[in-house]
Amino acid sequence: MSHAAETIYDGFLSNVEKALGKIDIELGLQIMLLERKMHDAYPMVELEIHYKDGVDTASKVSSVRDKYGFLVAGHDKHEVLARGNMNIDMIQEIAQDPQIEKLTGSASVASY
């Protein structure tokens, strides 16, 4: 790759990383790409929500399930897993919780 293209790409990644905050950049880019390719359905996301020490993850499981209707389960004492059709706006809304350290996971084409 040319030096100019690499510089542009590095700048792009830096800007996206700043905009996404706690959201893993690869996850965010996957979701946004799928949103643009498949206009009629949100991507299927397997979201790993990593909480800070001391957070009651059982209550977080309930609140995420109640608010969004996702399949949600506690994974360990600091992690909650959520699966459902999500767009980047939903992920950014979830990331607003000050008790979250980071959001990771994967996204794929939704199935009906």
Predicted regions, residues:
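Autoinhibitory N-terminal propeptides
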Residues: M1-Y112
